[in-house]
Amino acid sequence: MTNELKRTPLFEEYAKYGAKTVDFGGWELPVQFSSIKDEHDAVRNRAGLFDVSHMGEILVTGPDALNFLQNLLSNDVSKIATGQAQYTAMCYENGGVVDDLLTYKLADDHYLLCVNAANIEKDYDWMLENQHQYDVTIDNQSDAYAQIALQGPLAEEVLQSLTSTDVSAIKFFRFQENVEVTGHKVLVSRSGYTGEDGFELYGAPEDIKALWGKILDAGQDKGVVPAGLGCRDTLRFEAGLPLYGQELSATISPLEAGIGFAVKLNKEDFIGHDALVAQKENGLPRKLVGIEMIDKGIPRHGYKVFKDGKEIGEVTTGTQLPSSKRNVGHALIDSQFATIGNEMEIEIRGKQLKVVTVETPFYKRSK
């Protein structure tokens, strides 16, 4: 690793657990600790703890905070109450995606945006560029926060053992500020990127650093493990959650990517609104579908998809599922071919191999 890679405040902590690190968008982060499969299974059946301190935090404050965010974001920010989080997209005028993110409402004039690590500067610049006449302060506070995610069916039990706050009262996509966890005050959000129940904890770097070991110690007897980026990707993919740069990008709209639930075309105008309305009215040119290999092989990001010799799209994410060993992927293809059960081909090392479109998500937790 070169010295140029950024490290999170937890780097020294997770190094103690045998982390194998990789360059992830300029950050030196753990791809795995034991193995991707073991960590994936732990999160599905018990719980895993992730360092997600590389994610960005941008604060928006001021009397025009709501109006500014309504213009900036695709979801309807007016619908969330204080203490509630909302998944949304930030779009360009052409409907392409600047980023997908979470909006946390701290107060009527105070919002926290959690953005993707690779997009922090781009998002911040885009927000400043579109501040216009709005009376708001936009503050990139990414360095002031660290963040960990405790994910899995045992997440609530483990977290509850460390705090007197009733965490069962924090419902999905709700959060509570100033929760004291073993003496460390943090924001606790019931949310995540795995398809499981879980919590994301935001706080000062020194507090989150201290909590990393304490949470793992508390969960050790229950089989809770440190988890890396490798299983974070297989978990989110299996659950049908998009990854910016693969399922979403400046050239892929939120409607094409299947996150139309985060786009409210009937609210007041927002950046990208007209382009997305036109897409919906004229029919989406492309759709994201699930694919499964018929022939032997594993679909990978960037592989081209063909129908009767004609290129119709490409794979956005693909892998062998750790749980079921199915060789599956997401592919963005011409809409006319997006019906379930349609056979097509993907090109792997110069060979065209058969795939079929299938239902997604590949995993849905039982409530």
From Swiss-Prot:
Q: Which Gene3D superfamilies match?
A: Aminomethyltransferase beta-barrel domains, Aminomethyltransferase fragment, Probable tRNA modification gtpase trme, domain 1
Any idea which GO molecular function terms this record carries? aminomethyltransferase activity; transaminase activity
Q: Which reaction does it catalyse?
A: N(6)-[(R)-S(8)-aminomethyldihydrolipoyl]-L-lysyl-[protein] + (6S)-5,6,7,8-tetrahydrofolate = N(6)-[(R)-dihydrolipoyl]-L-lysyl-[protein] + (6R)-5,10-methylene-5,6,7,8-tetrahydrofolate + NH4(+)
Q: Which gene encodes it?
A: gcvT
Q: What does this protein do?
A: The glycine cleavage system catalyzes the degradation of glycine.
Which major enzyme category is it? transferase
Q: EC?
A: 2.1.2.10
Which InterPro entries does UniProt cross-reference here? GCS_T, GCS_T_bac, GCST_C, GCV_T_N, GcvT/YgfZ/DmdA, GcvT/YgfZ_C, TrmE/GcvT_dom1
Species the sequence originates in: Lysinibacillus sphaericus (strain C3-41)
Q: Which UniProt keywords apply?
A: Aminotransferase, Transferase
The annotated subunit structure for this chain is: The glycine cleavage system is composed of four proteins: P, T, L and H.
Q: What is this protein called?
A: Aminomethyltransferase
